Amino acid sequence: MPPKTRSQTGAKKVRRKEKKNVAHGHAHIKSTFNNTIVSITDPSGAVIAWASAGQVGFKGSRKSTPFAAQMTAEAAARRAQEHGMRKVDVFVKGPGSGRETAIRSLQAVGLEVGSIQDVTPVPHNGCRPPKRRRV
């Protein structure tokens, strides 16, 4: 049996990111009790840039802090600005602590915030909530 030779078929192909020229878009901020995720999309909903607290470098309980939300929103906004984003409409979802901080940091980076909407899903008395924690 001849020795096996290695081939490059398993190598990863790195695709270059193309610059999208989008001036106006949507910023979706999902702020949970454990994490904050910011996705910036074009008006049709295609994601241009995103960031999460874990991706920015926070681990464990530090992901749920307002500072982590601030850094997450800044990272996503900078990536979106590379694609020409200047103005966003903000959609906030979830009960987390980083909601307002993320919006403020979007403005601080230089994105103009057009409107802010709360799109947190509210049940019409659907599932029973989890029991209260006793610590």
UniProtKB/Swiss-Prot annotation:
Sequence segments annotated as region (Disordered): 1-28
Recorded GO MF terms: rRNA binding; structural constituent of ribosome
Keywords linked to the UniProt accession: Ribonucleoprotein, Ribosomal protein, RNA-binding, rRNA-binding
Pfam families: Ribosomal_S11
Biased composition (Basic residues): 12-28
Cellular component GO terms, alphabetical: ribonucleoprotein complex; ribosome
Ranges of Polar residues composition bias in the record: 1-10
InterPro entries in the record: Ribosomal_uS11 (IPR001971), Ribosomal_uS11_bac-type (IPR019981), Ribosomal_uS11_CS (IPR018102), Ribosomal_uS11_sf (IPR036967)
Any single biological process term in GO: translation
Described purpose of this protein according to its UniProt entry: Located on the platform of the 30S subunit, it bridges several disparate RNA helices of the 16S rRNA. Forms part of the Shine-Dalgarno cleft in the 70S ribosome.
Subunit (UniProt): Part of the 30S ribosomal subunit. Interacts with proteins S7 and S18. Binds to IF-3.
Family listed: Belongs to the universal ribosomal protein uS11 family.
Protein name: Small ribosomal subunit protein uS11
